[in-house]
């Protein structure tokens, strides 16, 4: 059985730590110390590091881990150019990574947040990096709104039972934005209550699920009439279709603060 643990890093990052017996895999280790500390609790061998994209808060701990850990060197997987490690195993759309005999991840290209962004999809689980968050999605740093829209839509077509492990704890801020767009959405209110309780107890709000995101995430709900109307009011013009709505929402969210009204 694969155990998945969230290792907090920086202010709001999560490094996802996958363990099977003494072996472990980490995804997006922006810092080395949380990984080393967790390895000391009985997981003696880090066998692989997976990277979703090149931002430093996802890759910053790789070099230190490679230099400081005893035993065989972990394999490092990621998009081309994500890290200077000469042993980087470059992966892209459609590739598979078999981490254990019974556990394989498929690589999905999901550009938008960055052009090189990858997600890792396994049996009923997804590691989307900074492409999809709970009740939100990543900012545009390199790609276009159209690319990010297509990537989010693609992930949204995964089975509803898919557990989603984003790389940041942004849930409450995202739900504040979502609730302003859909004040009558009881599922958003229910989830906000659960998420608030989790954070008060210093617990992650994650993983989420694809079905939950279809219920609460405005970036997966651009075809909903209420979302469309809210985006049109904000833009002050008629919006032609889901991509136009998504584009307005993404730009709007960039400047949103939790106490700012959206209606």
PLM regions and their residue ranges:
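Active-site HxH/HxHxD metal-binding segment of metal-dependent hydrolases
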Residues: 10-11, 24, 29-109, 194
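Active-site-flanking alpha-helical
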Residues: 60-61, 119-120, 137, 175
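Accessory terminal helices/loops
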Residues: 153-163, 172-263
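Active-site-adjacent loop/tail segments of enzyme domains
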Residues: 136-162
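Active-site metal-binding loops of divalent metal-dependent hydrolases
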Residues: 29-31, 54, 81-82, 113-114, ...
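Core dinuclear metal-dependent hydrolase active-site scaffold
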Residues: 6, 17-19, 96-121, 125-126, ...
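Conserved beta-strand hairpin/beta-sheet module of binuclear metal-dependent hydrolase folds
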Residues: 1-44, 118-133
């Amino acid at each position: 059985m694969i155990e998945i643990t969230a290792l907090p890093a920086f202010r709001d990052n999560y490094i996802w730590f996958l363990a099977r017996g003494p072996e472990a895999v980490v995804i997006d280790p922006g810092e080395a110390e949380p990984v080393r500390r967790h390895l000391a609790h009985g997981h003696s061998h880090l066998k692989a590091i997976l990277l979703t994209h090149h931002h430093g808060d996802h890759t910053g701990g790789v070099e230190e881990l490679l230099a400081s850990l005893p035993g065989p060197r972990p394999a490092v997987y990621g998009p081309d150019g994500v890290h200077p490690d000469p042993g980087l195993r470059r992966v892209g759309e459609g590739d598979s990574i078999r981490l254990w005999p019974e556990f394989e991840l498929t690589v999905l290209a999901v550009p938008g947040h960055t052009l090189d962004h990858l997600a890792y999809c396994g049996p009923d689980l997804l590691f989307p990096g900074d492409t999809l968050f709970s009740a939100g999605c990543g900012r545009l740093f390199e790609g276009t709104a159209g690319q990010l829209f297509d990537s989010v839509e693609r992930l949204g077509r995964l089975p509803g039972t898919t557990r989603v492990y984003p790389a940041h704890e942004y849930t409450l801020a995202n739900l504040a934005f979502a609730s302003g767009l859909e004040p009558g959405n009881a599922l958003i209110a229910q989830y906000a209550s659960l998420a608030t309780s989790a954070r008060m107890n210093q617990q992650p709000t994650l993983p989420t699920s694809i079905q939950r995101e279809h219920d609460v995430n405005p970036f997966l709900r651009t075809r909903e009439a209420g979302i469309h109307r809210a985006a049109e009011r904000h833009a002050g013009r008629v919006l032609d279709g889901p991509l136009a709505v998504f584009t307005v929402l993404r730009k709007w969210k960039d400047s949103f603060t939790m106490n700012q009204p959206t209606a």
